[in-house]
Amino acid sequence: MESNHKSGDGLSGTQKEAALRALIQRTGYSLVQENGQRKYGGPPPGWDAAPPERGCEIFIGKLPRDLFEDELIPLCEKIGKIYEMRMMMDFNGNNRGYAFVTFSNKLEAKNAIKQLNNYEIRNGRLLGVCASVDNCRLFVGGIPKTKKREEILSEMKKVTEGVVDVIVYPSAADKTKNRGFAFVEYESHRAAAMARRKLLPGRIQLWGHPIAVDWAEPEVEVDEDTMSSVKILYVRNLMLSTSEEMIEKEFNNIKPGAVERVKKIRDYAFVHFSNREDAVEAMKALNGKVLDGSPIEVTLAKPVDKDSYVRYTRGTGGRGTMLQGEYTYSLGQVYDPTTTYLGAPVFYAPQAYAAIPSLHFPATKGHLSNRAIIRAPSVRGAAGVRGLGGRGYLAYTGLGRGYQVKGDKREDKLYDILPGMELTPMNPVTLKPQGIKLAPQILEEICQKNNWGQPVYQLHSAIGQDQRQLFLYKITIPALASQNPAIHPFTPPKLSAYVDEAKTYAAEYTLQTLGIPTDGGDAGTMATAAAVATAFPGYAVPNATAPVSAAQLKQAVTLGQDLAAYTTYEVYPTFAVTARGDGYGAF
């Protein structure tokens, strides 16, 4: 055990050094600090087998900052054999609020999640525990829409190593074009992390275009027992003009009367079957078939548990619903700037960003026969999922908005259609005065005029002191990021209770940082300046009406990042974890 007393073992001079040395003396495990984390075991003493398979690692969050392995290891040992624990550490010797624990098998990991989630580790301090995901997928934005999958795959293999596959989705409006982004799959998390570091904006361009790169939402893994009971199909790559009736007819052709109902959202749909056998048969028969001029992809919908890793990662949240019904669908949604004139969000289902809005449908047809569904301006994300015992159906994840049928306490959203009412078609844009533009629209127009590229919004989430989910958007402007790679993304200093408010606030903050005044901008700038004076002496916020220099821009964006980190560290037990923390830029 002498090696454990060397200066490089991560223990000398640390907090609770005596307790930690007693722990490794008792267990025989090694404890070494490297790359901002302290690793216990991996492998444990006497381990001669291969490392545990994927799915054996759990994420433990909401750790008290002064809690260390001497308290956490004995707790985990009661559940199963620990292969490895990795605790993230800061420069002050405290933990960063979370750790990863790998058990010897999946059953132990599953039991650990059940037993340790919401476990009171100290008086009033509850742990947040969920499955960890070994993310191997990157999101790459800014790709020319005319490029094909084979071209993108070839280009990514030229600039990065370990590329396994590229996922490209056709445009909802024009199937001959892509959506301007792709998902790149790598052979390992390490390969993906190294590629992400290499592809940071400003370092590499694709076809002469600046690109935006970030972690994609990890693919949700569902156990076989749960998937064996699924009888709902997810159908994507539909034409916008394809109707629910057409989809139902096509799937009923496999077995008449097998389909219970169909729900289509823009270019994807969920098809409900009365039994699983019919669903599987239809999936095998229709996957890849051309429907209404477009080849469709058909898969089983994936149930999402309320305690899944998705809830704890940086992008969780969104706009949800409260209707009591049979199913909850998690809808992948991305706002398409090419259709802003419609005044409404555009729905499709790429595996893009990480918000998970929900849409509920009743268990029986005709439930809404005398109701009008009116779009809800905002509602707590995943509320409906929690209300239904934590089960939803996942197509893919993305950001955007949900639709509420009922249950929003902010104001009534449903009204009866009364006799004599006339429903008049109209453009939603006409509902607002034409002279007033929201901050996201202003930011988009400015980026277009200056050829900066489309702003990329990244949704993040944190849990407030009252256990309320809060949201924050980070904004990356491709051209500015390529010119000043060290100062992106634009990170506002405050979180919002609603996703739409967070997006507007992020756009306002970005405009103010760029020196462009917005409605209420003076007050926001003054508030920011006050926060700066209190928390970060020496920082200065650029005048909102004066031209902004590169130095001011860098200083202001750095300030925003520091303020966000300060707020998160001091107030909110955040779960801004995108993947593993092995020192390769995963966070």
UniProtKB/Swiss-Prot annotation:
Alphabetized CDD domains for the sequence: DSRM_A1CF, RRM1_ACF, RRM2_ACF, RRM3_ACF
Compartment annotation: Nucleus; Endoplasmic reticulum; Cytoplasm
Gene Ontology process terms (BP): mRNA processing; protein stabilization
Domain RRM residue range list: 56-134, 136-218, 231-303
Pfam families per UniProt: DND1_DSRM, RRM_1
InterPro entries assigned: A1CF_DSRM, ACF_RRM1, HnRNP_R/Q_splicing_fac, Nucleotide-bd_a/b_plait_sf, RBD_domain_sf, RRM_dom
Gene Ontology cellular component annotations, sorted alphabetically: apolipoprotein B mRNA editing enzyme complex; cytoplasm; endoplasmic reticulum
Record key words, sorted: Cytoplasm, Endoplasmic reticulum, mRNA processing, Nucleus, Phosphoprotein, Repeat, RNA-binding
Record's keyword annotation contains Cytoplasm: yes
Annotated positions of the Phosphothreonine modification: 491
SUPFAM superfamilies reported for this sequence: dsRNA-binding domain-like, RNA-binding domain, RBD
Main localization (coarse): nucleus
Molecular function (Gene Ontology), one example: single-stranded RNA binding
Quaternary structure, from the entry: Part of the apolipoprotein B mRNA editing complex with APOBEC1. Interacts with TNPO2; TNPO2 may be responsible for transport of A1CF into the nucleus. Interacts with SYNCRIP. Interacts with CELF2/CUGBP2. Interacts with RBM47.
Function per UniProt: Essential component of the apolipoprotein B mRNA editing enzyme complex which is responsible for the postranscriptional editing of a CAA codon for Gln to a UAA codon for stop in APOB mRNA. Binds to APOB mRNA and is probably responsible for docking the catalytic subunit, APOBEC1, to the mRNA to allow it to deaminate its target cytosine. The complex also seems to protect the edited APOB mRNA from nonsense-mediated decay.
PANTHER family, per the entry: HETEROGENEOUS NUCLEAR RIBONUCLEOPROTEIN
Domain text: The RRM domains are necessary but not sufficient for binding to APOB mRNA. Additional residues in the pre-RRM and C-terminal regions are required for RNA-binding and for complementing APOBEC1 activity.
Protein name from the UniProt record: APOBEC1 complementation factor
Species in which this protein is naturally found: Pongo abelii
Lineage per the UniProt record: Eukaryota, Metazoa, Chordata, Craniata, Vertebrata
Gene name per UniProt: A1CF
